């Protein structure tokens, strides 16, 4: 589930959106595929969908996985129970809308959705891409910031991205 907005109203993005394309390209299934783009939803709908993974947008800078983990309304959602809520990375640009960094987003998402199938060195790919795209060689701390390592700490599979 790509959570397009958390506050003031919950919103998700369904089929026909770049967010749906991203999920499918990474080998996932968008539980919100039946709705349109940026549709207002409620917690009951999220409960009915029972997503295994929740992706948090970058359009709300203060939105973190911890907010969902601490929100009692989300307590019974499988993604929350199993610590599979992820803040999408943001580097030279946000990774959730289509951009020159989208291939990195697809790699990141595939690593998290299918840890048993993929094992590429994402941090190296980020450094290489930023060198090519921006003429910038990020150090380990800069890559941690791109990947929101602190915000995603404790999420399943995130240790492999450190």
Label each PLM-derived region with a short phrase.
Residues 1-162:
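N-terminal ligand-binding lobe of clamshell/alpha-beta domains
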């Amino acid at each position: 589930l790509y959570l397009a907005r958390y506050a003031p109203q919950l919103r998700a993005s369904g089929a026909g959106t770049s967010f749906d394309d991203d999920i499918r390209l990474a080998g996932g299934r968008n539980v919100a595929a039946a709705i349109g783009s940026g549709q207002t939803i409620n917690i009951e709908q999220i409960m009915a969908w029972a997503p295994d993974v929740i992706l948090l947008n970058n359009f709300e800078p203060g939105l973190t996985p911890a907010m969902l983990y601490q929100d009692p309304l989300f307590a019974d959602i499988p993604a929350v129970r199993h610590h599979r809520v992820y803040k999408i990375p943001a580097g030279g640009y946000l990774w959730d809308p289509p951009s020159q960094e989208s291939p990195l987003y697809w790699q990141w998402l595939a690593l998290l959705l299918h840890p048993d199938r993929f094992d590429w060195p994402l941090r190296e790919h980020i450094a290489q891409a930023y060198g090519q795209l921006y003429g910038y060689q990020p150090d380990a701390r800069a890559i941690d910031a791109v990947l929101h390592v602190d915000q995603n700490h404790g999420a399943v599979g995130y240790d492999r991205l450190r």
